[in-house]
Amino acid sequence: MKFLITGGAGFVGGNLAVMLSESGHSVLCIDNLSRRGSENNLKRFKDYSNIHFLHCDIRNKEDMSRIKFSPDVVLECSAQTTAVDGYNNPMYDFTNNTAGVINVLEFCRERNCGIIFWSSNKAYSGDFCNSIPMHETETRFVWSDSKYSARGWSHLGFNEDGDLNGGNHTIYGVTKNAADILIQEWSSAFNIPSIINRLSCIYGPHQFGKVSQGWIVWFALAKKFGSQLKYYGFEGKQVRDCLHIEDLGNLILKQSQNIHSHFGSYYNVGGGIENTTSVCELSNNLDLRMNISHLETINEGPRRADQKIYISDISKVSSEFNWTPKISLDDGLESVLSWINDDSVDFSWIKQ
């Protein structure tokens, strides 16, 4: 198959490009190279003759028209991915995460190809997620009432029946939500094969995490290089399900090969109930694995629209694609630490 990957020099896009190439597929990556770490992925691509790169910005329709490659599927990985930055510059989130997607959809319509889109767990509002009864333990929030029921939620996590309405999605979440609905509409109106994945926490090697995004890898990097760590609210008891990038790649291969039989479908995708951690649990886990003393952690106020618990119910995607995550959080962290300890990777920016 032939793949066009937008945001192809980023963490998800770059890893998918390599995985697809190693599976024998042809890949064109496009990226505006605005994200730190992009240059490292470009270096990786040089080892693969079937990965090509074009400097391109999806916000620019003329850039998209320069693409001569005709893919079978577009993997739409481009985004401004930081949930908190949009409050400072909402238009930047909108142009990257919503308006640019329209250009990608029009490209798909003109080239008669499918699209797989990276949406977000922020499609579901913080108000809804935090309305589920919960209590605190020493290290995490836990759902409380075994008899409680709500549309879009069970003790396996949040499922696709959840309402996209409500407040506190974050600006980032709203722009991804809008793109999510746009893709559903374009797919229906113009017969574009589409699959939407509402992703939870994705992590793994080659993720240049930072304070505001990519927190699992950021914590590992900060601990290795002695940078200050902060818990933003709730003493780090917020819980997420975590999915390793290799498991995501295996799912994308299955979805790409079956996109026509899952036309217009959307899925919650993450590590699921078996792969969860709180922020402070992750910090303690890394201390043990890295054999370091616990660094002092500053507690600051919570971020707006933060979900105290978000765990994906992956029943639907698991059933329809015969897919489940294979890499445990423990094994996934070991892969991250192995990459961080690779002397050939440039981490000089974190020391500045």
Predicted ranges, named:
Residues 6, 95-98, 172-173, 209, ...:
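Short, solvent-exposed loop/helix junctions and linker helices
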Residues 35-40, 62-71, 115, 166-168, ...:
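Short, charged helix-to-loop "capping" segments that act as catalytic/coupling loops
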Residues 1-200, 335:
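N-terminal Rossmann-like NAD(P)+-binding domain of SDR-like oxidoreductases, especially those catalyzing
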Residues 129-157, 171, 177, 181-256, ...:
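NAD(P)-dependent short-chain dehydrogenase/reductase
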Residues 16-22, 221-352:
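C-terminal substrate-binding subdomain of Rossmann-fold SDR/epimerase-dehydratase oxidoreductases
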Residues 59, 123-124, 202-204, 248, ...:
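Conserved sequence/active-site signature of Rossmann-fold short-chain dehydrogenase/reductase
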